[in-house]
């Protein structure tokens, strides 16, 4: 069994079974799936997000593997990713409770509780009208570079997101947002993978997903080149020469994802 409790849950759950206590938490349920529940709760006026994972069974695990999908078996992936990103200086959530019980991955019970990041707006919402009403050029440049740095630092730290879309980057709005003063945090790491080094295959999947998610916000060629230069931390001439295969693949992959979105909506 693994268990880490910080305040206020260390105090609230003192003398209680934390796996029963977390199941008893009340709040707004955001997702209820077989084997996983996500909700927002409040303690002492402060918001927290709770993800509870219950064993999905060997049948579901096998079905995922047969369809080339890596199943999410518990909260450990998000816990490990959050810890690694904090070590690397990448702004993300803060976990205040984590528990894992059971060695059988098909029946394991686990949970993670993170502090709510608020007030915030995700970049998909923030940029949704950029085509019609472009943002100040300096702000757009600053945001493009900030996302590129975050994703680059994340990958160099050995973490790949697997859901690397602009909606999973939160812009903090506790004060006016400007090119010279803003904060971003990356969230929703329940599918993230953490290794000593990020394999190119998974790095490339993240980059293609990010590019796809930004296709409709009016980015120019110059914006895209700025992202590449910041992400790779190399001269553009070298990037365009050495990463030509990746860039062509990203275009094709993003186009396929975009076509699927047009056909099926958000059910990718």
From Swiss-Prot:
Record carries keyword Kinase: yes
Cofactor(s) required for function per UniProt: Mg(2+)
InterPro entries according to UniProt: Kinase-like_dom_sf (IPR011009), Lsacc_core_hep_kinase_RfaP (IPR017172)
SUPFAM superfamilies registered for this protein in UniProt: Protein kinase-like (PK-like)
Gene Ontology CC terms: cytoplasm
Phosphotyrosine modification, residue list: 30, 48, 98, 165, 211, 231, 258, 264
Main location: cytoplasm
Location of the protein in the cell: Cytoplasm
GO BP terms, alphabetized: lipopolysaccharide core region biosynthetic process
EC number assigned by the record: 2.7.1.235, 2.7.10.2
Reaction(s) the record says it catalyses: an L-alpha-D-Hep-(1->3)-L-alpha-D-Hep-(1->5)-[alpha-Kdo-(2->4)]-alpha-Kdo-(2->6)-lipid A + ATP = an L-alpha-D-Hep-(1->3)-4-O-phospho-L-alpha-D-Hep-(1->5)-[alpha-Kdo-(2->4)]-alpha-Kdo-(2->6)-lipid A + ADP + H(+); L-tyrosyl-[protein] + ATP = O-phospho-L-tyrosyl-[protein] + ADP + H(+)
Assembly behavior: Interacts with acyl-AcpP. The WaaP hydrophobic channel can accommodate acyl chains of different lengths, but myristyl-ACP is likely its physiological binding partner.
Function: Kinase involved in the biosynthesis of the core oligosaccharide region of lipopolysaccharide (LPS). Catalyzes the phosphorylation of heptose I (HepI), the first heptose added to the Kdo2-lipid A module. Also has protein-tyrosine kinase activity: autophosphorylates on all Tyr residues; in vitro can phosphorylate poly(Glu,Tyr).
Protein name, per record: Lipopolysaccharide core heptose(I) kinase WaaP
Gene source species: Pseudomonas aeruginosa (strain ATCC 15692 / DSM 22644 / CIP 104116 / JCM 14847 / LMG 12228 / 1C / PRS 101 / PAO1)
